[in-house]
Amino acid sequence: MQKTYLLALVSLLASSLVEARSTIADQTRLDVGGSDESFDGIDGIDPNNSNVLTHKLMDKVIASSELLSLHRSLVEIKSISDNEQAVGGFLMDYLSSKNFTVEKQYVDYDDPTGKPIRSNRRFNIYAYPGDSASPGIILTSHIDTVPPFIPYSLSHPESDSFKRDDILISGRGTVDDKASVACQIIAAMEHLEKHPDIPIGLLFVVSEEVGGKGMSTFSDSRLNSGTYHTIIFGEPTERALVAGHKGMVSFGIRVHGKPAHSGYPWLGRSAVSEILPILAEVDRLGDIPVSQGGLPSSEKYGRTTLNIGFMSGGVAANVVPEQAVAKVAVRLAAGDPEDAKDIIFRAIRNAATKHRKDATVVISNGHEQPKGDIEVIFGLEAYGVVDIDADVDGFNVTTVNYGTDVPHWKIYGDNVKRYLYGPGTIFVAHGKDEALTVGELEAGLEGYKTLVAKAAERERT
């Protein structure tokens, strides 16, 4: 009797466990590999903990895909600008294992005056199949990220049911720019498997986020052979082809005052009081017409925008400030950067002398003894608007306001096509919520494959 009772109890518990697992599977189902798969068959975890089950299966989705697992490996490696050697080493090993010939190109650092400092810590990676060192098609992205490092993580929508495409991949570089790096590698591998007669090169550069030293180093080297007819640049474009982006001018303003006790301000000259009207004038240069001393606009790119991104001055509230500094980034919508510099300098000089008639405004490199009360220090990097090809059918076309490595690559030869494309949106790049979905990443791969196929057609003709 007791034995029969125990057997019945065991049977009831087993039935309840199966029912519980079935309920969880029904409530939280995930499309894996194109087919619905419940959580049945996953052993060693608590069947009543749906969060554990969900993360286990999301991890399975990533591990089952060459693209997704490569992307995860890249994002898990910290590669903030100037510290890219670890991710570079990983890529060298990965590409070598896929039968690419891989060349390492060291990239110098620059001191504050722009003088190169030799380094063997960071490097570009140039890869190609076999001995095809001068391919006609090159895919390129950058491997550095902005700070801070944010670890790789997976999450899913708050829903009883979701598909694998909905899995959200978060972390620094998931969008900018390791999504493009992963997609470009897989697109190249799939192309070469089908068309080994049309080689593809892969170029992954450092330092894009801090001035483009990686790309300019490649551009000035023997590796920039000029034999290519198509270059596909990777950046987050929401899978649209970018028809161009704004130009860039950066500058700083340094005002030299005279310190004094705050109780007797007339004995000194406040650098902060002098820089404020200058910045007010600078801030409106994109909003006023060129005829009134403003910066140009265009139908394609809209108006030129300025961002006063940094300002500091003084040492204490009871001291008249001896120095004030500001840094400004300008996104040019039209015109030559040298003309823009002239407009900016005139605006600063006019605002300064309006505030104080005897103010002296000079252009400086920022490292020599100042020859005026107010220094204008233009950055080493400056370029005008960048027009890019967008002639492949099947894509949305847009323009963007951010800078890229496109202008840093010196093009040799005629009729070279340049495309800018990639998964993810710039609106989350550089932020704490940088992320994209599995669906976005995989759709990005398909876009790269289309661009590569179009480039291959050009090579055949």
From Swiss-Prot:
Annotated glycan sites: N48, N99, N396
Cellular location(s): Secreted
InterPro entries assigned: Bact_exopeptidase_dim_dom, Peptidase_M20, Peptidase_M20_dimer, Peptidase_M20A
GO biological process, one term: proteolysis
Catalytic activity, EC: 3.4.17.-
GO MF, one annotated term: peptidase activity
Binding residue positions for Zn(2+) 2: D176
Residues bound to Zn(2+) 1: D176, E209
One GO CC term on file: extracellular region
Active site, per annotation: E208
Keywords: Glycoprotein, Hydrolase, Metal-binding, Protease, Secreted, Signal, Zinc
Family from the record: Belongs to the peptidase M20A family.
Name by which UniProt lists this protein: Probable carboxypeptidase MGYG_04702
Organism annotation: Arthroderma gypseum (strain ATCC MYA-4604 / CBS 118893)
